[in-house]
Amino acid sequence: MTSVLIVDGANVVGSRPDGWWKDRAGAARRLHERLLVADTSYDEIVLVLEGAARGGVKAGRDGHVLTVHAPRDGDATIVERAKEAANRESEVTVVTADRFLRSRVEGVGARTMGPGWLLDQLG
């Protein structure tokens, strides 16, 4: 069974008051760079970006990280990706602090973790 980590980029970046709002694209790029070198047990990491953050990282695969540009809101894309992965019988973990989104992805079979957990994993 493969394991997939889906990252709510906006939520993770927004969890730390480090000035991300001044450069959303740069903040997304920094998160992507950290995910690329992360030593995790996940077979695939899906980074979902929306709005201005999409300008920081090209959509597509880079090693074990797949960056997805949400065409609308990131939440709908995250739920869609979680459902697709669960349907492939993957073990799915979604990183977000958004309670409503957590409920939605748990409804399609994913487990959830908060941004603090991921940031601790990234060191």
Label the predicted regions.
Residues 2-6, 10-123:
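Nuclease catalytic cores that cleave nucleic-acid phosphodiester bonds
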